[in-house]
């Protein structure tokens, strides 16, 4: 199915479902109309959601307001809002790692009964997003959100630079293989070193952009994206919260050493505290051959006047030294805030958003739908140049702790990773030993032992 067929199918799906959607929302009369506020991060998908939500407003009579906060302060602002019982947000598209705290502290309403009453099945969504965004405790049928935006860390690369005949010849002469999308992290580093300092498009370029940001979650998302494939585990699979020899295993140490080596060898200058936005800027300005970033950035690259179209390619996280291949989960679910006085109206938004035709339009506008009916459609993989990479990446995801103590756990990893990778303090083993000790202390305070 080509893109035109995909677009036509989405239009037909929308038409066939329109009356059902209107009926589902029809119980909200003009006299009952509410002003609802949805809280999320300030990024391109949020703008797409504003556009998408116009249809909900027209059908429901409710008016949507939006509170969008930059990613670097999103967690602080919104977790404070939840912890204080604030009434700013009726709907929250909260980060995946917040689900444990929001559930256990009564900050989101449980959605099981609502889903059952309205025929919304979690089996209809990508399994990794249900576990990652909706379930608490994990791997139990207790749902606190509807998967709203599937996301994952992957890579973009300068397809045009890779294809340039002189680059192909020089790379093969040096490494004995074709210059192609890396299948392993070792291959990725070779490519990064090859491009480091090379001249492309008339200027000096750099090998690879990776996350280093200290203040929120940046370097943790980047380092974990690599450590998973090297053999890092959060704890003993047979003994929860038993971290010694798993967080700080020899394989995990090798992964953190690799991440630092990639930063030291091949990052652009001035990237010692950089996250998503800096990566976008570095790639669009032609500074780097490869760039680590969440999939939400890919539509913007595809349409960019400088790097769009055939100039940019996409690939999933490569494999580690033993063949393990994982990627850091991103993305969020949409929840109803327990402190809201407009819960019934907020639930009508979730019901509307869950409709297959709305999810198809969400993808078309630049949102990453987690609905199987969208992503498993035969036309999906070819509907955008990055669609197949998104599917491949979502099949290998892992995520950070989603415990109620998430913020404290994240602060520890941010400190230890940044101090070692960027500041060059101590060794990788010392960093992971320190991290394991900090995490153990946090869980001891929670009574996990």
Indicate where each model-derived feature is located.
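Conserved C-terminal helix/tail region of periplasmic/extracytoplasmic solute-binding proteins
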Residues: 63, 392-449
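Extracytoplasmic "Venus flytrap"/periplasmic binding protein-like
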Residues: 35, 51-128, 132, 165, ...
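Extracytoplasmic/periplasmic solute-binding protein
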Residues: 135-149, 153, 184-244, 288
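Glycine-centered hinge/linker elements that transmit conformational signals in sensory
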Residues: 187-196, 230-273, 317, 436
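Extracytoplasmic "Venus flytrap"
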Residues: 36-51, 69-72, 151-152, 217, ...
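Extracytoplasmic/periplasmic substrate-recognition and gating elements
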Residues: 137, 141, 160-161, 243, ...
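Mature extracytoplasmic/periplasmic domains
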Residues: 55, 279-280, 295-304, 320, ...
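Hinge/lid segment of periplasmic solute-binding proteins
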Residues: 96-154, 219-222, 311-315, 379-385, ...
């Amino acid at each position: 199915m080509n893109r035109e067929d995909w677009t036509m199918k989405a239009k037909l799906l929308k038409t066939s479902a329109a009356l059902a959607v209107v009926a589902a929302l029809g119980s909200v009369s003009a006299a009952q109309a509410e002003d609802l506020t949805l809280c999320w991060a300030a990024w391109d998908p949020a703008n797409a959601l504003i556009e998408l939500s116009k249809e909900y407003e027209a059908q429901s009579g409710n008016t949507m307001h939006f509170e969008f906060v930059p990613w670097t302060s999103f967690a602080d602002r919104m977790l404070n809002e939840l912890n204080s019982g604030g009434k700013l947000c009726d709907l929250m598209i909260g980060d995946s790692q917040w689900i444990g705290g929001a559930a256990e502290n009564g900050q989101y309403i449980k959605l099981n009964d609502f889903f059952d009453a309205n025929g919304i099945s979690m089996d209809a969504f990508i399994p990794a997003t249900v576990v990652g965004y909706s379930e608490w405790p994990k791997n139990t049928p207790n749902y606190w959100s509807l998967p709203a935006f599937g996301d994952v860390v992957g890579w973009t690369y300068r397809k045009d630079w890779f294809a340039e005949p002189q680059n192909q010849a020089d790379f093969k002469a040096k490494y004995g293989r074709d210059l192609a999308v890396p299948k392993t992290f070792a291959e990725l580093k070779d490519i990064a070193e090859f491009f480091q300092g090379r001249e492309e498009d008339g200027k000096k370029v750099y090998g690879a952009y990776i996350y280093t940001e200290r203040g929120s979650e940046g370097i943790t998302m980047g380092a974990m994206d690599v450590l998973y494939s090297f053999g890092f585990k959060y704890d003993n699979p047979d003994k929860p919260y038993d971290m010694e020899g798993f967080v700080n295993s020899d394989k995990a140490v090798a992964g953190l050493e690799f991440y630092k080596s990639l930063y030291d060898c091949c990052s652009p200058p001035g990237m010692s505290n950089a996250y998503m936005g800096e990566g976008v800027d570095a790639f669009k300005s032609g500074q780097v051959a490869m760039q680590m970033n969440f999939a939400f950035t890919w539509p913007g690259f595809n349409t960019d006047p400088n790097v769009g179209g055939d100039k940019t390619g996409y690939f999933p996280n490569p494999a580690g030294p033993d063949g393990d291949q994982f990627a850091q989960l991103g993305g969020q679910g949409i929840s109803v805030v327990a402190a809201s006085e407009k819960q019934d109206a907020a639930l009508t938004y979730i019901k509307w958003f869950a409709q297959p035709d709305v999810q198809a339009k969400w993808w078309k506008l630049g949102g990453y739908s987690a609905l199987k009916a969208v992503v498993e459609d035969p036309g999906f993989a070819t509907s955008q140049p990055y669609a197949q990479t998104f599917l491949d990446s979502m099949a290998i995801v892992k995520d950070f702790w989603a415990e109620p103590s998430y913020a404290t756990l994240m602060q520890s990893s941010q400190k230890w990773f940044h101090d070692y990778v960027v500041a060059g303090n101590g060794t990788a083993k010392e960093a992971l030993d320190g991290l394991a000790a900090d995490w153990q202390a946090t869980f001891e305070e929670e009574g996990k032992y």
